A protein has these predicted regions:
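A compositional/biophysical signature of low hydrophobicity enriched in polar/charged and small residues
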Residues: 1-76
Length: 76
């Protein structure tokens, strides 16, 4: 399995809805609202790096009110 953390910047006052939408995506293991530079953080997993890339680019980044993401791929 391939694992990553995804950090999200979202539109103001949309955190709760985006969190709900992120948690509904297959491959998302956990997700939380956070304080600081980013608004949400999620831990994701996929069988391959290709699937991990698709999970981020075709699903998570397409959620309404997501402005930017930062993906941290775990290596150990």
């Amino acid at each position: 399995m391939n694992h990553a953390y995804v950090l999200f910047n979202v539109e103001s006052n949309s955190e709760d809805q985006v969190l709900k939408d992120v948690r509904a995506v297959d491959g998302v293991q956990e997700a939380y609202v956070v304080y600081g530079v980013y608004d949400l953080a999620a831990r994701i997993e996929a069988v391959s790096m290709t699937e991990l890339k698709e999970l981020v680019s075709r699903h998570l980044r397409m959620i309404t009110n997501v402005k930017t993401t930062l993906t941290l791929i775990l290596v150990e």
